[in-house]
Amino acid sequence: MSGTFHGDGHAPMSPFEDTFQFEDNSSNEDTHIAPTHFDDGATSNKYSRPQVSFNDETPKNKREDAEEFTFNDDTEYDNHSFQPTPKLNNGSGTFDDVELDNDSGEPHTNYDGMKRFRMGTKRNKKGNPIMGRSKTLKWARKNIPNPFEDFTKDDIDPGAINRAQELRTVYYNMPLPKDMIDEEGNPIMQYPRNKIRTTKYTPLTFLPKNILFQFHNFANVYFLVLIILGAFQIFGVTNPGLSAVPLVVIVIITAIKDAIEDSRRTVLDLEVNNTKTHILEGVENENVSTDNISLWRRFKKANSRLLFKFIQYCKEHLTEEGKKKRMQRKRHELRVQKTVGTSGPRSSLDSIDSYRVSADYGRPSLDYDNLEQGAGEANIVDRSLPPRTDCKFAKNYWKGVKVGDIVRIHNNDEIPADIILLSTSDTDGACYVETKNLDGETNLKVRQSLKCTNTIRTSKDIARTKFWIESEGPHSNLYTYQGNMKWRNLADGEIRNEPITINNVLLRGCTLRNTKWAMGVVMFTGGDTKIMLNSGITPTKKSRISRELNFSVVINFVLLFILCFVSGIANGVYYDKKGRSRFSYEFGTIAGSAATNGFVSFWVAVILYQSLVPISLYISVEIIKTAQAAFIYGDVLLYNAKLDYPCTPKSWNISDDLGQVEYIFSDKTGTLTQNVMEFKKCTINGVSYGRAYTEALAGLRKRQGIDVETEGRREKAEIAKDRDTMIDELRALSGNSQFYPEEVTFVSKEFVRDLKGASGEVQQRCCEHFMLALALCHSVLVEANPDNPKKLDLKAQSPDEAALVATARDVGFSFVGKTKKGLIIEMQGIQKEFEILNILEFNSSRKRMSCIVKIPGLNPGDEPRALLICKGADSIIYSRLSRQSGSNSEAILEKTALHLEQYATEGLRTLCIAQRELSWSEYEKWNEKYDIAAASLANREDELEVVADSIERELILLGGTAIEDRLQDGVPDCIELLAEAGIKLWVLTGDKVETAINIGFSCNLLNNEMELLVIKTTGDDVKEFGSEPSEIVDALLSKYLKEYFNLTGSEEEIFEAKKDHEFPKGNYAIVIDGDALKLALYGEDIRRKFLLLCKNCRAVLCCRVSPSQKAAVVKLVKDSLDVMTLAIGDGSNDVAMIQSADVGIGIAGEEGRQAVMCSDYAIGQFRYLARLVLVHGRWSYKRLAEMIPEFFYKNMIFALALFWYGIYNDFDGSYLYEYTYMMFYNLAFTSLPVIFLGILDQDVNDTISLVVPQLYRVGILRKEWNQRKFLWYMLDGLYQSIICFFFPYLVYHKNMIVTSNGLGLDHRYFVGVYVTTIAVISCNTYVLLHQYRWDWFSGLFIALSCLVVFAWTGIWSSAIASREFFKAAARIYGAPSFWAVFFVAVLFCLLPRFTYDSFQKFFYPTDVEIVREMWQHGHFDHYPPGYDPTDPNRPKVTKAGQHGEKIIEGIALSDNLGGSNYSRDSVVTEEIPMTFMHGEDGSPSGYQKQETWMTSPKETQDLLQSPQFQQAQTFGRGPSTNVRSSLDRTREQMIATNQLDNRYSVERARTSLDLPGVTNAASLIGTQQNN
């Protein structure tokens, strides 16, 4: 191929035109590219590290303590030893000269009186540690970022910045400078051991610490005080030891549970600390001192190793998983022996199954022992020295790894510490790591060794090397690291420097993959490693009921105090009453006076009425919540078979919160969508390629009144036909070894034909150049497929990037591997190597990525060129396009902008690709600045961004891409269900506005009847409200509130909004971008207006938002409106939002598992959220809301009966009940019914819960649990306590309690049997009456609980040890009066409540009672068991079923739950007014899918010429009207020639959405021209 093409309005010039050929007779010589030659003669300034200084905000004490030294450009050197003279901080932000030792030339500082400490990472001038190990671990606690700070640094943890200033220097094979050692020659700096301990206890501290921890619980302290009081005889406790049994049992059970949990952590700690790695021996590590191991530590070490070996043996021989691993290991060893042989190298190095194809692709291995140092090699290994035979790598434990050690990690081994990578088995110094344990991401990541040490291969090489590393301090940020490798060049004696970034670091917790070995120097150990600094615990959450339960407990404490106070006063008054037997028989009693006796009686009453605050309540609640979590985990309908992932509860104590959720905050990418990117369309040189029928497009056409099912079938059939044609032509085009037809997503037979030259040579070369740019500008890795080694799988950190590279591969531009210098691309069957000079990585603030490729000169003597390829957001790229004449064709820019607008309207994610060609001198000047910025330790990221920004300008547009992120299965149905349940959904996404809007339409979040209220800081609103962004946002909020809702944003309106939990009546939706949201969250007044506006809208879309903004929005709603919030996401950028919400849901998706690890519940797909919330959440809330008041009610009966008894014995503290009754009332007699009520009760089954989601609203309105209900149950308990006591008392008072032999039953314990039996049967029957689910299982447990009281009375009273209670059962149960009183009292206890419930259910049925009646009449029989409306494979209901659905929708479910005015007869009537599904104004109450209008050709033309359309196209453009007219002419021409679909333009004109950040053709052109 010959010839050139220039920027003449057709296409940009290709700098690759002379570097590759596509004719069949191409030779390998044409593919050669000259390698890069590194300049050995570079001056020290190029590699020197800039001077470290402090800013004005640095605390004084931090400046004084910064004693690390750095080498500057003006470093002085000793003439004999070439040792640098460091400069130490003098406290003023500068550095003073430091005296060198005359003998060694090492820098030193005098530290008089310095003391050595074992732990700590830094010392002050007195020798005391500034940061100890315990304090180091505290840095793991991370807070949610401030939403009002600069969001360009959202990924930086403030704690990480502070600790990063604690600089450290590590020397290898060199003596330490004198300022770094003390008088004894030991290093001053002390680093944490690599041994970690995550356990709470040790064998010696378990008992005291665990007991102390348990008694942080106020309830335990309360009951301990009661036991202590009971130990004193004066308080009249019959058996003090027996009274302690319940608390002792609870403490023991809890201690056993804690011991089991901690033992698991102990086992894990032992496994980690005793994991083996390979550490270099023979070279003394000067950075750490030798430990003096005490005899006690030796004893502990021996025991821990024995314990570890025992645990390992048990795991391998007793567990199925261990047996399987043992067999796999044996098979692997056998395979290695067969492969390697007895004389081969050891298996740890050469028995690794490596499928990777990267740096060593197609090249023979090299013998590095005989390798001579080349001219371009960094002169760091002194090969003139004789090899040391004493240096070797030996196995050691992780806990023995120290800072400064050289370690070697083998394939599939975990990294033992944070390590600077020196070399790898890869000839190019690359290795692959899996960071799943660190950040949850499953994609492999590449790490590169330092260039200066890449040739190190053996222990002999590393022993002949000397260097030191200057590093920042430890911090928790996983994605940044700054350091410098320094060494003295052997050739000229000058100090050389190579910057170290996070790409040169292996972090602890990661696993080495597909690399035989990697070698590095340990920089951080133990608590200083990033994984330990990030090991903060997910914030502890308590459910709303648990929080409100505390108030109920306080009420009971108040009641307890009143009862005790009355008892004490009454007993004191009765004490002085004349004529009492006390004066004759109790002279000189312990109390001694009325006041003292009243005081003692108060505490006696506290012991007596203690069951008012039941200790068993907390245990029962924990049992119930644990069982609920187990049921959620075991639900097979929440199991994702594709991921092999069930719904996993991480927080077991908030299941009831799932039943009260009012607001759901959702991410879009990977949550609503699959995050599986498919390349669908592209625009190259003004020509659009690709066919796709996306879900967003289907939603758009559905709103236009088109039959999308028919059209979808037709479109998909035509696409499939074109796909087959395209695949056949691609096969005939070239010999693409990486072509796999089943993976093709880009369908365009026109593109393949243009690739052959059908539209001319210019368009052909444009297509080739565009795809080559996609194949070069990326950070993707390739890995051989285990099942098919010839097939290369793409491993990318971003699914978008993988889609771009995969499409380039599909059309013949295959990325097949990396080398040390660049990339290997197979172009139409011919492999070429492209040298990559620099990669400017993507981040959230840049929104772009670039690479610089070296292009050889046309002739052997010509100067090479450099080509910058840049890809990024369309608005970013257009703002950086060159405006020079002849650089970018205006027509192509307009066509590309219109294509991108069309793609975005179809719901596709758009990117632009551009380039810039540089002369070699321009590149070298820029690269010098880049090297200086890269070597900076302070603000390296900021400096690199400034340098990158300077070159990513004056770009030439190549084209644009469009990628589809498909909706997850069942998302539209799930959102519709949640809306019908009354739950409001807010979408918080970092994606573009138009993409979010189209996804909103396609997933039923938005409908065509909604009016979108846009909040932005640009566009026409600037003229109306002013130029200040904050003024614009404030004015827009005030305008919308007043115009649409007649609100002002006052505090009174917020107070009223807290009471209103109804679904918004209006048909409005909010759209706001990140810039406007940042201002809306700043300031109390504007924040209040924003919140009120959003509350009154049906849907809220926050686009282009940062992670901290997501968290801020959630906290704003949760704290200001006092509502239950749920956040759901799948990526690391959703963690802050998930942890801020009351309930956090993580989706196990494509972006890793970090969101899952930080969540409260983890699910496999978004659609499972409906079942989790509407079924399990509603059940859990309803069960717990009924169980808790029942618990207080039954204790109220039992305790108040004692109070009524006190009236007749002067409140002297006598026990009415035999003491074992006091113990077993809550433990055995009445506990099981309420516990099983909280675990198993169901008002309706799971299918009905999903088919009738309106039942969920009772949780939003908090009708099931409130203080009113609690007080009502307490009053019921008060009434029944009166019946339980006074019915037996009246019989006793009339002397009616006699046995068949005439003996009386006048003992108080006998009366207590009457009271206890009546109370137990009444309570258990009361629970049965309030239980919806009556089956044999629940009936069995209630019957057993009722029988236990009779059984225990008979067993215990038959024992002589019962003393006064002896033979009580025989005498009482043999008396007819007992059975008469028993039945009458139970009847009177339950009759009022039974009457009230029956009246209410018949005349004022609640919604659930109406639905239950329908259920009994068979209206839901047509639904199969486990029917899920969100399941895309659900069975279709029959006509009878549809008829049933119509009846269900017609139920008059009232907004006032529990107060419906419809009788039971209305349930079976078909003529029912639909008041629930629609508001009072007739508007839909949920996200209803609407059918709208169709457009005729005439209407289309009228709309295009209407002022409304013109207004819709003016957003974001400059003042020039020529731009608009030129773009409109281009648009009309493209529509006329079928290059642009007019339906999209009509839709945009119809809706007239003036949206922020929308990919709008006019705004893009305006951005480029205003640049």
UniProtKB/Swiss-Prot annotation:
Effect recorded for Y575 to N/S: Decreases phosphatidylcholine and phosphatidylethanolamine uptake
Primary localization class, coarse: membrane
Effect of V558E: Decreases phosphatidylcholine and phosphatidylehtanolamine uptake
Residues marked Involved in the release of the transported lipid into the cytosolic leaflet (site): I615
Modified residues (Phosphothreonine): T70, T85, T94, T109, T1551
Effect in UniProt of substituting F587A: Decreases phosphatidylcholine, phosphatidylserine and phosphatidylethanolamine uptake
Binding site for ATP: 667-669, 801, 842, 844, 847, 871, 909-910, 989-991, 1104, 1110, 1133-1134
Effect annotated for changing N550 to K/S: Does not alter phosphatidic acid or sphingomyelin uptake
Record's compositionally biased regions (Basic and acidic residues): 29-40
Effect of E586A: Decreases phosphatidylcholine, phosphatidylserine and phosphatidylethanolamine uptake
Keyword Electron transport: no
Phenotypic consequence of N1226A: Decreases glucosylceramide, phosphatidylethanolamine, and phosphatidylcholine uptake
Residue spans crossing the bilayer: 215-235, 240-260, 554-574, 595-615, 1189-1209, 1220-1240, 1271-1291, 1308-1328, 1335-1355, 1376-1396
Record EC number: 7.6.2.1
Domain of life the protein comes from: Eukaryota
Biased composition annotated in UniProt, kind: Acidic residues: 66-76
Outcome of swapping K578A: Decreases phosphatidylcholine, phosphatidylserine and phosphatidylethanolamine uptake
Maturation and modification: Phosphorylated by FPK1 and KIN82.
GO cellular component, one term: mating projection tip membrane
Membrane topology, record value: Multi-pass membrane protein
Assembly behavior: Component of a flippase complex consisting of DNF1 and LEM3. Interacts with LEM3; the interaction is direct and required for their mutual export from the endoplasmic reticulum.
Family: Belongs to the cation transport ATPase (P-type) (TC 3.A.3) family. Type IV subfamily.
Functional note: Catalytic component of a P4-ATPase flippase complex which catalyzes the hydrolysis of ATP coupled to the transport of glucosylceramide, phosphatidylcholine, phosphatidylethanolamine, and small amounts of phosphatidylserine from the lumenal to the cytosolic leaflet of the cell membrane and ensures the maintenance of asymmetric distribution of phospholipids. Does not appear to transport sphingomyelin, inositol phosphoceramide, or phosphatidic acid. Required for efficient endocytosis.
Name of the molecule in the record: Phospholipid-transporting ATPase DNF1
Organism: Saccharomyces cerevisiae (strain ATCC 204508 / S288c) (Baker's yeast)
Lineage, opening ranks: Eukaryota, Fungi, Dikarya, Ascomycota, Saccharomycotina
